Amino acid sequence: MTTSMLNAKLLPTAPSAAVVVVRVVVVVGNAP
């Protein structure tokens, strides 16, 4: 897989991935 192909696949999913990261951080922060 080339870098351009990898970027083409990652760029569209970046916003949703960021949302998932934020949710995980919030859940972990509220866990204790």
UniProtKB/Swiss-Prot annotation:
Keyword annotations of the record: Amino-acid biosynthesis, Branched-chain amino acid biosynthesis, Leader peptide
Keyword Disulfide bond: no
Domain of life where this protein originates: Bacteria
Coiled-coil stretches noted in the UniProt entry, renumbered to this chain: none
Biological process terms in GO annotation: L-valine biosynthetic process
Role played: This protein is involved in control of the biosynthesis of isoleucine, leucine, and valine.
Name of the protein: ilv operon leader peptide
